[in-house]
Structure formats: structure tokens, C-alpha cells
Amino acid sequence: VHGLPETLDALRRHIFNNVIWPDFTRLPHADRPILELVPFQVGDRLTLGGLRIEILPAWHTVPACGVAAETPSGWWVFTGDTGPNPALRECLRGRPIAQLVIETAFNDEERALAEISRHLSPSMLAQELLQLDLDPNTPIAITHVKPGEMAAVTGQIAALDLPMTVFALTRGERYRF
């Protein structure tokens, strides 16, 4: 399992602690565990399973990150939980983005909550997308919409008349790019 050091520490303390679950980082033997926790930092570039990825900055209330994976058609980007994020925009500037998966947790009536919790609402999403200067043909998928918010969030995004196609990810659906 690869993750930020803070996330891996939380897994050690709260999950793999022999209270909730056994410590699989030491089982069946300390020298041959089932599970290895491997830290990474924002900005790290890794090759995992033949796929080149980069760990991206996120702006959230707890340690978080995004991921970009290089593909033959460009970069597939997942923002993770994030609010407005100048560091992410700078990191992505000039890259050919094949697809962007970006969180949009709350509707615009709950924008204040989105700001406090460092998430996005539709109008905040629009600001981020326009500042990214993406090719209008880049597919934009929203994710992390809070329960009961999907109709309001997608309706508000549609009303923004953005120059790119924005759609909500659907559970169980497979996407190719």
C-alpha cells in the first residue's frame, strides 16, 4: 500500500493495530509480511506495475493528495479531496490532460461548507477548470458528490455552460480514454 506518511501512520495506529485488524505488516512473518506500507511524498514520481505516476498536491483539511498517470493519450488526473488548489493548477500547467477526475462535493447553496471543508462546489469547480486552461475536448468527470447532492450538483454544473464536457462518474461503469 502506497500513501502519504500521515495516512500510513493512521493505518498502523487505527487499523493494523491487533485491535481492529491484525498487523499484516508483520504477518505471517516480520521478514515476509502480507502487506507493506510504502510512503511517498507530493511531487514523487513512481513507476508501479509499468505505469508512470506522479503524486499531486491537494488542498484539504487532512493530509491528502491526487495522482496523475501517464498514458499514451496524455495524463489521467485524479485530484483526490481538494478545494481550490493553485499548486495543483501549476503542477498540471502545460501537460496534455487525457481526462480529469475532480471532486465536487457540495452544491452551490453549500459553498460556505465546501470552502470550510476544502472541497469544491459547481461554481468553484468552474473557476478551477477555467484556470487550468484545458483543451475543451478534455473529458471532465466529477466524483465525491455527497449523498443526496447529485441532482443539484449536476444541474448547477450544466447551468454554468462550461466550454468542456463535465459528467458524473457512475458506480460500476468502466471508462476508457
Regions found by a protein language model. Give the residues of each.
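Structural beta-sheet core signal
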Residues: 1, 77-78, 140-142
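Active-site HxH/HxHxD metal-binding segment of metal-dependent hydrolases
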Residues: 1-29
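A short helix-to-beta-strand connector/capping loop
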Residues: 28-36, 49, 136, 162-165
